[in-house]
């Protein structure tokens, strides 16, 4: 089966947009064109990804980064590495990947990703995950 993710709520942060990347394991793409930096918090509440309108950097020491399937095992001592020069970045976030539970009677599961800006404080992008068996 596959996990289908959807966004149910996006915070009202000027310049922020989020879309789900549909795939066998869903991902999320954020685009940010706001005036002040925006930080995505990781699964442990740590600073994970920083967005400005012209750059995206990731914290290679973040447990969320280390858990990504496509991250390199070799990291330098530098904590923040530039990943994009566009203000947009997509990744396979573990919060969008539920265990493949064939008992779908539980209904959709919820997910949330915290984002923070100096002006707005911490807010959440929230959504639902639904397991869909493939016949």
Predicted regions and their residues:
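N-terminal soluble domains immediately following signal/targeting peptides that reside
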Residues: 1-135
């Amino acid at each position: 089966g596959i996990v289908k993710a959807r966004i149910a709520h996006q915070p009202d942060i000027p310049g922020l947009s989020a879309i789900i990347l549909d795939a066998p394991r869903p991902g999320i793409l954020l685009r940010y064109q706001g005036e002040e930096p925006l930080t995505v918090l990781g699964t442990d509440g740590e600073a994970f990804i920083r967005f400005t309108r012209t750059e995206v950097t990731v914290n290679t020491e973040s447990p969320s980064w280390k858990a990504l399937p496509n991250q390199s095992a070799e990291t330098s001592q530098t904590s923040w590495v530039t990943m994009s020069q566009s203000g947009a970045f997509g990744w396979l976030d573990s919060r969008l990947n539920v265990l493949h539970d064939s008992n779908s009677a539980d209904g959709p599961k919820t997910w949330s990703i915290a984002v923070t800006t100096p002006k707005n404080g911490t807010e959440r992008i929230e959504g639902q995950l639904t397991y869909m068996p493939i016949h």
